[in-house]
C-alpha cells in the first residue's frame, strides 16, 4: 500500500474503499445508544482549533518529530457517536481528515501539512469484557500498557502485542501487532475477533460498522482488512474485540495467559573489539540461530531478542530481549548467547533481570514523553539469514568514516514460532514464513 493511498484515509479513499467492502444498505450500524445514557459523561466531542489552549498538546503529540503537521482542528472524542460526527463534519466540509491514537506512527500519515482535521482517540481507553460477544473490548485510544495491565489484572490474560507500552492499540493492531510473546502466541491480529469502525459510504454518510471474523458475517472482509491491512486505510477504528478462536464461557480461557515472570536481558559487544571477521561471524550466527528456531516446535519459542547492529560511533552492538518462561530461562539465554558468540573473540557484557511479567510489559512508563526522536524507519521480513555479501555491505555502512553520525543501524528481531502456524491468507498479514523481522 503506497503512502499516497494510505494518506487518502478518510477523504475520497475511505469512501471508495468502504463502498467496495461494505454494501450500503446491508450493513449493521453499530448503534451508539449505549454511549453514555446511565454512565458518567465521556470527554468530548470538542473541536479544538488554533485559539484553544489544548491545541498544542493535541496537535504535536506524535513520537516522530521528523514529521510535523498543523491541522485546522483536532477533535477530542469520547464515544463512537462522537467519531461519526467528526467524520461527517469533515466529509461535509471537504476537509482532509485522519486519526491519531497512540501517536507512535513512524510516517507522516497524521502529522503532515496536508492534513486538516485530526480525530484524537486518546480519551477512548476502555478495556472490558463483553459477555455478549464473549470477547475483550478494547477502545482504540488505549495504550498497550493500559491493555496489558487491565487484561492481566482483571482476567490473567493478554494479547501478544508490542514491547513499547506507549504504543497505541489503534494503529498497532492494524499493522499486525508483533511483540515479545508472539513466537509463543502469534500476532495480536491472530486473536482479533471483531472491530468497530467508522466508515463513509458512497453517499457520503458516516456511520459505525461492526465487522467480525464469523464466517457468516457479511462484513467479514472488513474484519479481514483490519488484520494487517495497514492503519488508517479503511476507516477509523473505535473498538477492537479480542478472543482467541476458542470455546468456553470463562473469560480467563479466551485469550492466552502470559508467564508469571520473565528474564529480561541486555547483551552488548564493544565495537572497538569487533573486527570485520568477528562482526560477520556474529551476524551469521544470529541468522543461523533464527532460521533454526523459527519453526513452531522450537524449544526456544519463549526467547525473544532484538539484535541492534548500530553504527560504530555509538560504541556497542547490543541485543535486548526477554525469555518468557517460568523455568529454564537462564539456560535458554546462556545457550542463545553461546550460539551467537561461537567463534567471536569478544566476550559480551550481559546484565539480566528477573521480573514479574507485568513489570516487564509496562517498562517504558506510559505517559512519559521521553526524548524527542526524529526518525526514518523501514522494515522487512527475512526468510533466510543475510548472505556474506549482504553482511559485508552492512559492515561497510555501519563503520564508514565519511559519515560520523552515531545514529542509524539495522535491528534484527527474532520471528516465527506460532506466528508461522497461520495460513498467509487467513489474515491480512501474509508474512508467515519469516525467521527475522528487520527494522
Ligand atoms: C517506540 C516504538 C516502538 C514500537 N514497537 C513496536 C512493536 O514492538 N511491535 C510492533 O508491531 N510495532 C511496534 N511499533 C510500531 C507501531 O505499532 C506502529 O507505528 C503503530 O501504527 C502505532 O500506532 P499508534 O496508534 O501509536 O500511532 P498513531 O501515530 O496514532 O497512528 C499510526 C497510524 O495508524 C493510524 N491510526 C491510528 N489510530 C487509528 C484508528 N483508531 N483507526 C484507524 N487508523 C488509526 C493513523 O492514522 C496512522 O496512520 C513501534 C513504534 C514505536 C515508535
Describe these PLM feature segments.
Residues 1-17:
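N-terminal secretory signal peptides and thylakoid transit peptides that target proteins
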Residues 19-37:
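C-terminal region of N-terminal signal peptides and the immediate post-cleavage residues
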Residues 36-63, 102, 107-110, 252-439:
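Cofactor-binding catalytic cores of oxidoreductases
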Residues 52, 63-124:
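Glycine-rich N-terminal segment of FAD-binding domains in flavoprotein oxidoreductases
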Residues 65, 110-139, 180, 184-185, ...:
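Glycine-/small-residue-rich beta-strand-loop submotif within the FAD-binding core of flavoenzymes
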Residues 92-96, 114-115, 154-158, 233, ...:
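Loop/turn elements at helix/coil->beta-strand transitions in domains of secreted/extracellular proteins
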Residues 134-138, 142-152, 168-169, 353-357:
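Short, structural beta-strand-to-alpha-helix junction motif
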Residues 161, 166-270:
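FAD-binding subdomain of flavoenzyme oxidoreductases
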